[in-house]
UniProtKB/Swiss-Prot annotation:
GO terms for molecular function: ATP binding; cysteine-type endopeptidase inhibitor activity; cysteine-type endopeptidase inhibitor activity involved in apoptotic process; metal ion binding. Residues 464-758 form the NACHT domain. Pfam families: BIR (PF00653), NACHT (PF05729), Nlrc4-like_WHD (PF22524), NLRC4_HD (PF17889). GO terms for biological process: apoptotic process; cellular response to estrogen stimulus; epithelial cell apoptotic process; negative regulation of apoptotic process; negative regulation of epithelial cell apoptotic process. BIR repeats lie at residues 63-128, 162-228, 281-346. This is Baculoviral IAP repeat-containing protein 1a. Both the BIR and NACHT domains are essential for effective inhibition of pro-CASP9 cleavage. BIR3 domain binds to procaspase-9 and the NACHT domain interacts with the NACHT domain of APAF1 forming a bridge between pro-CASP9 and APAF1. Anti-apoptotic protein which acts by inhibiting the activities of CASP3, CASP7 and CASP9. Can inhibit the autocleavage of pro-CASP9 and cleavage of pro-CASP3 by CASP9. Capable of inhibiting CASP9 autoproteolysis at 'Asp-315' and decreasing the rate of auto proteolysis at 'Asp-330'. Acts as a mediator of neuronal survival in pathological conditions. Prevents motor-neuron apoptosis induced by a variety of signals. Zn(2+) binds at residues 315, 318, 335, 342. Interacts (via NACHT domain) with APAF1 (via CARD and NACHT domains). InterPro entries: BIR_rpt, LRR_dom_sf, NACHT_NTPase, Naip, Nlrc4-like_WHD, NLRC4_HD, P-loop_NTPase. ATP binds at residue 476. It comes from Mus musculus. SMART domains: BIR (SM00238).
Length: 1403
């Protein structure tokens, strides 16, 4: 066997690129880009993985077992993949062919695994039907014996002779040594890997690595004389006892089976279907309504079997259905015409020859034919228990054979396979579930250990009395029917050991019926009959070879005596029983069970498998289904039973047009199913739903999803009521008291929502009050959008005119519950939420921390959307409008809210909104941090010398730069797969023409953009034309303005603000800006270019109120301003930053003409005209912000005018120096008059150092102070004064205290400060950093004092302490404090420098 593997050039593509545009539209990403990136990663993984023939995975059952941990959110089932030769590698989602080593990472809705396999590796010998040792999942080790060994039996008495027979032993079986096999008495037959004992004639095959030939010999043929001559009876007994599965089963049970068929050994083309067997397909046409037997034969050869409905035939391989077959049609041509991709038709030989060829390839040799199915008519082929009996004594045997044939005939009929589920799900019959493997775990009654089982493992372990438990609709009936069908088909060798299989429904029997009577009534039909005596004799003779499949078990008390005895006294009959039991009823039968099987949640891959069966013509809808549940991870478990899947199918049939795949539709369909099933008990069902809803509601708001009997009783739920079992499950295993759960957490929320709607819609006031009580438990936006998001969605799916206004009003008031906001975020834990919800919750929390304003806009938009949807669903828009209008008043919302229907119906409501914002984000990735600039700032510093214990206080900049670079690449790749989508303006307000009301103010944020494309331009043209005022905020977006020129020219009179940062303005763009007559605010910052044309013509903006120019290091800005610049009479904000010397004369004149100036920031280095500047500033009584930096400042003139600014809120002089004490004292005194001051950044200098304590005491006169900063000037005395003022009642509103770079403070001074600081209830940010040369190595007492200080600051979220050298013990103290802090989840401590050098570490 040649090694198969991928070379470095052997790249494969799993992607169907022709379908990617459709996927791009659904996902909103560039699927082609994503696919290419994904293929590259997968190729790298392939290159690492081991290649070559894997003999350990030639067993399909073993391959199937590898998928136990495989993600179920896939479009291929494990059964399909295992049948196609694949096993799960454990590397991501990679699957690999055992034969050709093909590795696949993806699934496909359009291609089956076998189709993908054949396309990518047509040369695979497994696919070509060659003998590569594949072992079918239902195959067994025991083989039919040869009539005569080659050369005669006597020839092989000697071990060496036996060993010589293994000359052509197949490569795939080399894991089992021919020498060991020959020593155990076996001779190689020459057929596959089948060996035969020279003594007893027993034949075994399917040898795998690790098999013990002696153990296999002893298990299957314990009476062999050669075996008994070599092994003691105790050894043989130990071999048998230690064998896994097949209890009480020997080889003769399989060899003498009455239901044996010749099987195609290559399962790859069979799509896991028993109808790969041509004979079985022929059997399905027994009830074929057409006449021509020739046509039937042709249909069978074309791979088709009869479904039993309306003349419809179906292909066993591709699943395609055809009907209206007429005389003269060529079924193969018709099959190929409608289903050209069918693998069965694409096999190397013609379709008519494929299956016979597969069968003949693996056919049993002639010597084995005596035990094939032809032995039904062979009088010589008799059961081993009949040998030596007389004709009359063997009567039971003939009856048993006849009974077996009748049973098989019944089970293979379409009427048995197809059992319609109740009316609502009539389209989905059990025959569509036959091909699905349910997920099963095994629970041995005497052992608490549970283990997952594959279906082959279940079949191997059928013995004694077992049950299969599951929820309502979990697939118990289908599972039992599948066993009966597989047995009858003869296509499941694992079931050959059963001569009789009885599938009995216990729901339609009476206690007085005999067992034979039940069998005749349910299974044998009008012509069949068997006596009780004969049946008893058959069971007594066959014992373990009889399997009872008992469905609809409800309790021992209702059973006839015969069945009661079979269960409770199984040691008498020794038959096998598998009983289907609802989870609630297991307890009553547990003492009689050996093993309990439990059906777990129906895998989502099975759901997709079934949907593909029904909707293969609508792949787009299937794709949308996969995308929906991929994007809503928390919903993936809702299809937990086949019954829920049936509800999905029903919904799709009833709503053939594309609908959103909402979980509400699923749950509603399920409730409809219950109402149809229990038509005669409508009132009891309604009462049960109501009481269960109350329990669900109570549990939901106490985070309880498990309940006991007391909980049920309190809610009025009858735990013994059968209807309750349709909504809840009972769990009793390993528990003193039973535990009850709803069918799923989301289903509990659905029932709770039904109950809440019922309460709010009630005519009883106490019910309404109770409903309102529960509704008010949702007391924050975070809870509404995360914890109770699904619950609210379900509430809205039950619209109620009474509940509508109440719910809408409550939701819209949540945004303004500011007093609850912080506590909610502090206490709400997302560990116990589903992954998707937890991620959203974490993201919202981070958004709130980073930008409370954006957070408010986000939650406002989402709550408004939710509330409006409910108002429309409940038809209460008019009643809700007062709440809606109140909510809209003065708010800033996202532009997309205008797509809501409300703004089409009530466009006048738009006038209440403050503004609407729209963000346009491009795919450019700007450099977040320029490390070269940081490195330059450290050039003059010498690396500090520190002890080894403190080395962790410094981290290498290169490592951070590397990580940041990698992150930037990741962000770039992510951005590349998300194509820029223009804002959607397709519904709601945008349907109005003309627009009766305009958007009061449109805020347009543009980031990382290049020129806009035509689609975006068209959208902006429409949006701009509907806006009364437009404000731009552009960043890193050179060329964007020019690209939207047509939109700006149409609406230039509406543009009132333009803020531009880190972009280059072309001359054309500067000219374009100059055509905006209504511009009131202009900001230019951080650009490498001086937009001289724009600045030369600033006087043309006659209404300009705000001018911000931040161009450090650029040519003199003030010099390029026009002479007419001072004539701008409406200036309210003036912020100029330039590091060049500047002429202030124009600026002074402008201020002189600006009586309404509120904000003044200036940074420049010009030293003249300062007096005139101060003089003119003194007249600006309305100033609220003043900031001076650079050399253009004289302290005394400014201090003299400072008391004039009684409206001042922000004073920033942090970069100015006051050298003399007199000026500094005067400054300190003046501060007392600024009673509205909120931010004070104190100047530096010796003079300020001398009066620092006075400045601190003056802060007692500043009750509004939120920010206070001292740099370089504090010492031990002045810093302790801050603590004294705080304890005296000052700083009550202080949020930020910046004490960095105060190197005059000693460690003792800090320790005293920490010990004294208290009574700062709102302090969020404390900065005590030092320069690197001033690193401070602190004692344990200081660290302890710092920890105690932090504990007394309840609102602290940021502590900056760079250059504080902390060892491991110090950090333990700090971290312990952090863990106990009220803001533990938000508190961040900055204590590590990121530097371009390594410190000098002392040994």
């Amino acid at each position: 066997m040649a090694e198969h593997g991928e070379s470095s050039e052997d790249r494969i593509s799993e992607i169907d690129y022709e379908f990617l545009p459709e996927l791009s539209a659904l996902l909103g990403v560039d699927a082609v880009q994503l696919a290419k990136s994904q293929e590259e990663e997968e190729h790298k993984e392939r290159m690492k993985m081991k290649k070559g023939f894997n003999s350990q995975m030639r067993s399909e059952a073993k391959r199937l077992k590898t998928f136990e941990t495989y993600d179920t959110f896939r479009s291929w089932t494990p059964q399909e993949m295992a049948a196609a030769g694949f096993y799960h590698t454990g590397v991501k989602l990679g699957v690999q062919c055992f034969c050709c080593s093909l590795i696949l990472f993806g699934n496909s809705l359009r291609k089956l695994p076998i189709e993908r396999h054949k396309k990518l590796r047509p040369e695979c010998e497994f696919l070509q039907g060659k003998d590569v040792g594949n072992i079918g999942k239902y195959d067994i080790r025991v083989k039919s014996p040869e009539k005569m060994l080659r050369g005669g039996k006597a020839r092989y008495h000697e071990e060496e002779a036996r060993l010589e027979s293994f000359e052509d032993w197949p490569f795939y079986a080399h894991g089992t040594s021919p020498r060991v096999l020959s020593a155990a008495g076996f001779v190689f037959t020459g057929k596959r890997d089948t060996v035969q004992c020279f003594s007893c004639g027993g034949s075994l095959g399917n040898w795998e690595e690790g098999d013990d030939p002696w153990k296999e010999h002893a298990k299957w043929f314990p009476k062999c004389e050669f075996l008994q001559s070599k092994k003691s009876s105790e050894e043989i007994a130990q071999y048998i006892q230690g064998y896994e599965g097949f209890v009480h089963v020997t080889g003769e049970h399989f060899v003498n089976s009455w239901v044996r068929r010749e099987l195609p050994m290559v399962s790859a083309y069979c799509n896991d279907s028993v109808f790969a067997n041509e004979e079985l397909r022929m059997d399905t046409f027994k009830d074929w309504p057409h006449e021509s037997p020739v046509a039937v034969d042709a249909l069978v050869r074309a791979g088709l079997f009869y479904t039993g409905k309306k003349g419809i035939v179906q292909c066993f391989s591709c699943g395609g259905c055809m009907e209206k077959c007429t005389e003269g049609d060529d079924p193969i041509q018709e099959h190929n015409k409608f289903f050209p991709n069918c693998v069965f038709l694409q096999t190397p030989k013609s379709s008519a020859e494929v299956i016979p060829a597969l069968q003949s390839h693996c056919a049993l040799p002639e010597a084995m034919e005596t035990t094939s199915e032809s032995n039904h008519d062979d009088p010589a082929a008799v059961h081993s228990t009949v040998v030596g009996l007389g004709r009359s004594e063997a009567q039971w045997f003939q009856e048993a054979r006849s009974l077996s044939e009748q049973l098989r005939d019944n089970y293979t009929k379409a009427t048995f396979r197809h059992m319609n589920l109740p009316e609502v799900c009539s389209s989905l019959g059990t025959d569509h579930l036959i091909g699905c493997d349910v997920s099963i775990i095994s629970k041995h009654i005497s052992q608490p250990v549970q283990g997952a089982l594959t279906i082959p493992e279940v079949f191997s372990n059928l013995s004694s009395v077992m049950c299969v438990e599951g929820e309502t609709g979990s697939g118990k009936t289908t599972f039992l029917k599948r066993i009966a069908f597989l047995w009858a088909s003869g296509c499941c060798p694992l079931l050959y050991r059963f001569q009789l299989v009885f599938y009995l429904s216990l729901s339609s029997i009476t206690p007085d019926q005999g067992l034979a009577n039940i069998i005749c009534a349910q299974l044998l039909g009008a012509g069949g009959c068997i006596s009780e005596v004969c049946l008893s004799s058959i069971i007594q003779q066959l014992q373990h070879q009889v399997l009872f499949l008992l469905d609809d078990y409800s309790g021992l008390a209702s059973l006839p005596q015969a069945l009661h005895t079979l269960i409770t006294k199984n040691y008498l009959s020794r038959t096998c029983l598998l009983i289907a039991v609802h989870t609630n009823r297991v307890r009553g039968i547990r003492s009689y069970l050996d093993t309990s099987l439990e059906i777990k949640e129906f895998p989502l891959s099975n759901t997709v498998y079934i949907l593909k069966k029904f909707f293969s013509h609508n792949i787009k809808r299937l794709l949308e289904f996969m995308v929906y549940f991929g994007q809503n991870e928390d919903l993936q478990g809702i299809h937990k039973t086949p019954l829920f899947v049936a509800a999905v199918c029903t919904d799709w049939f009833e709503n053939p047009s594309d609908q959103p795949f909402q979980d509400m539709a699923l749950f509603k369909s399920y409730m409809q199913y219950l109402s149809l099933k229990h038509k005669g008990a409508a009132k009891p069902l309604q009462a049960t739903v109501s009481s269960c809803g109350q329990l669900a509601l109570t549990g939901l708001f106490s985070s309880c999803f498990e309940f006991n009997s007391d909980d049920l009783a309190e809610a009025g739920v009858d735990e013994d009521e059968e209807l309750t079992t349709c909504l809840m499950s009972k769990f009793t295993a390993q528990r003193l008291r039973p535990v009850y759960r709803f069918l799923g957490p989301l289903f509990q929320e659905f029932l709770a929502a039904m109950r809440l709607t019922e309460l709010l819609s009630s005519d009883r006031q106490e019910d309404q009050d109770l409903g309102l009580y529960y509704l008010r438990q949702i007391n924050s936006p975070l809870k509404a959008l995360t914890t109770y998001n699904n619950f609210l969605k379900y509430v809205f799916s039950h619209p109620s005119s009474k509940a509508g206004p109440t719910v809408v009003s409550h939701l819209l008031h949540l945004v303004d519950e500011t007093e609850l906001l912080e506590n909610t975020y502090k206490n709400e834990d997302y560990v116990n939420h589903p992954p998707g919800t937890s991620r959203i919750m974490k993201g919202l929390k981070e958004l709130w921390l980073l930008s409370p304003e954006y957070y408010s806009s986000f939650v406002s938009e989402h709550l408004l959307r939710i509330a409006l949807n409910f108002a429309y669903e409940s038809n209460t828009v008019a009643e809700c409008s007062p709440f809606i209008l109140q909510f809209l008043r003065g708010r800033t919302l996202a532009l997309k809210v205008l797509n809501l229907q409300y703004f089409r119906d009530h466009p006048e409501s738009l006038l209440l909104v403050k503004s609407l914002e729209v963000s346009i984000n491009g795919n450019k990735v700007p450099k977040v941090v320029d490390y070269s600039v940081m490195e330059k700032s450290f050039e003059t510093l010498q690396p500090p010398t520190i002890d080894q214990d403190y080395a962790s206080a410094f981290e290498q900049m290169k490592e951070h730069e590397k990580n940041l670079s990698e992150n930037e690449e990741t962000i770039k790749s992510i951005k590349n797969i998300f194509p820029l989508q223009p804002p959607k303006i397709s519904s709601g307000y945008w349907k109005l023409s003309p627009k009766p009301c305009k958007i009061p103010r449109l805020e347009v944020g543009v980031t990382n953009m290049g020129p806009a494309d035509q689609a975006l331009l068209q959208v902006l043209m429409e949006v701009f034309s509907a806006s009364q005022s437009i404000e731009f905020r552009l960043s890193d977006s050179s060329g964007f303005l020019e690209s939207i020129r047509p939109a700006l020219e149409l609406s230039k009179a509406s543009v009132t603000k333009c803020s531009m940062s880190r972009l280059e303005l072309s001359r054309a763009e500067q000219e374009l800006l100059l055509t905006l007559p209504a511009l009131q605010s202009l900001e230019v910052s951080e650009t490498n270019q001086l937009p001289d044309q724009l600045f030369h013509n600033l006087h043309k903006f006659l209404g300009l109120k705000e001018l911000c120019v931040r161009l450090d290091g650029k040519p003199d800005v003030l010099s390029v301003l026009p002479g007419e610049f001072p004539n701008l009479l409406h200036m309210e904000k003036l912020s100029i930053r330039t590091s060049m010397e500047s002429d202030l004369s124009k600026l002074v004149k402008l201020i002189q003409n600006s009586p309404n100036l509120h904000v003044f920031h200036l940074k420049c280095d010009f030293l003249s005209n300062c007096d005139s500047l101060m003089a003119v500033l003194a007249s600006c009584k309305k100033l609220r912000e003043i900031e001076f930096s650079g050399r253009c400042f004289e302290a005394m003139p400014f201090v003299n005018i400072l008391p004039n600014f009684i409206s001042l809120k922000i004073l920033n002089l942090i970069s100015q120096q006051f050298p003399d004490k007199e000026t500094s004292e005067k400054f300190a005194q003046a501060l007392g008059s600024l009673r509205n001051l909120e931010e004070l950044l104190v100047p530096t200098g010796d003079g300020i150092h001398q009066v620092a304590k006075l400045i601190v005491r003056q802060c007692l006169q500043l009750p509004c102070l939120r920010v206070l900063a001292f740099h370089y000037i504090l010492d031990n005395d002045s810093v302790i004064e801050i603590a004294r003022v705080a304890t005296s009642g000052g700083f009550q509103k202080l949020e930020k205290l910046d004490l960095s770079m105060n190197h005059k403070i000693t460690e003792e001074g800090y320790r005293n400060f920490f010990q004294a600081l208290d009574n700062l209830p709102n302090l969020q940010n404390l900065n005590i950093c030092r320069h690197i040369p001033e690193c401070i190595q602190v004692q344990a007492t200081t660290v302890k004092a710092l920890g105690q200080c932090v504990s007394r600051l309840p609102s602290l979220t940021r502590l900056h302490m760079l250059s504080w050298l902390l060892d491991e013990e110090d950090m333990k103290v700090i971290n312990d404090v952090k863990e106990r802090h009220p803001q533990s989840k938000r508190l961040i401590i900055f204590w590590k420098w990121i530097v371009p050098f390594s410190p000098v570490v002392l040994e």
